Amino acid sequence: MRILLTNDDGVHAPGLAALRQQLRHLGEVITVAPATEQSGVGHSITYLTPLVPKSIHRDGVHWAWAVEGSPADCVKLSLAELFVDEPIDLVVSGINNGLNAGINVLYSGTVAAAIEGAFFGVTSVAVSLENSDDNDFDAAAVIARNVIGEIVRHEESRGGLFNLNVPTAATESASEVKVVPMGLAQYGRRYEKRQDPGGRDYYWALWTQPDKPPAEMTDVTQLREGCVTLTPLHFNLTRDDLLSEMKDWNLRP
């Protein structure tokens, strides 16, 4: 199995290295990641500047390709051009430093890279670890390898898109894996107002928990319980339930 690995924290991020090491147990790992930090860029794509893959070496051998672009750029360039003659079987994005759950999935460069893989019909998994003072990426990578290994074992997963989140508690002791829907709660809805030396106001985004997590079981609620969460996603944003009704609306140009 040929695995394309990327992330949004950059090619030198510890989460990428930890996941790369574990994914080697599942197959050949090709790493193509952003040259710099790309957190929160969502599904942005580079059109107006060239994408230049730069070989990164460790211990004298090629380790990864670094691209001055977004996570989605890395996957799109890889699948459409770099490895078009050597098909990729699995795209994995992570390990992100911080959870990607609830509505924040839509902001995530980590998840966007996996979505891009799914655009190409390749099974794709985004992996994120709860941010803490002492992130154990190695433990999270083992969890990710085990879950991903089970995902690809099932024919139904082929071409699918999956979002895996690992809470800190799960890296410290045994935890369950909960298959749950994406919640609608929003992390980080607050800003801190400050002033620069010139007296001008500016605002700093704060990473805060959702005010009122939903009562139903979602990724947000189960992460709070210390469970690993796995959510199957899709990128079709159509409101199918409204299509038929809207055809009867008196819509005119």
Curated annotation (Swiss-Prot):
It is found in: Cytoplasm. It catalyses: a ribonucleoside 5'-phosphate + H2O = a ribonucleoside + phosphate. Its cofactor is a divalent metal cation. Pfam families: SurE (PF01975). Signal peptide: none annotated. One of its GO terms (molecular function) is 5'-nucleotidase activity. Keywords: Cytoplasm, Hydrolase, Metal-binding, Nucleotide-binding. Gene3D superfamilies: Survival protein SurE-like phosphatase/nucleotidase. The keyword RNA-binding does not apply. GO terms for cellular component: cytoplasm. Binds 1 divalent metal cation per subunit. It comes from the Bacteria. It is an enzyme of class 3 (hydrolase). Its EC number is 3.1.3.5. SUPFAM superfamilies: SurE-like. A divalent metal cation binds at D8, D9, S39, N96. The keyword Metal-binding applies. Nucleotidase that shows phosphatase activity on nucleoside 5'-monophosphates. Belongs to the SurE nucleotidase family. This is 5'-nucleotidase SurE. The lineage of its organism: Bacteria, Pseudomonadati, Planctomycetota, Planctomycetia, Pirellulales.
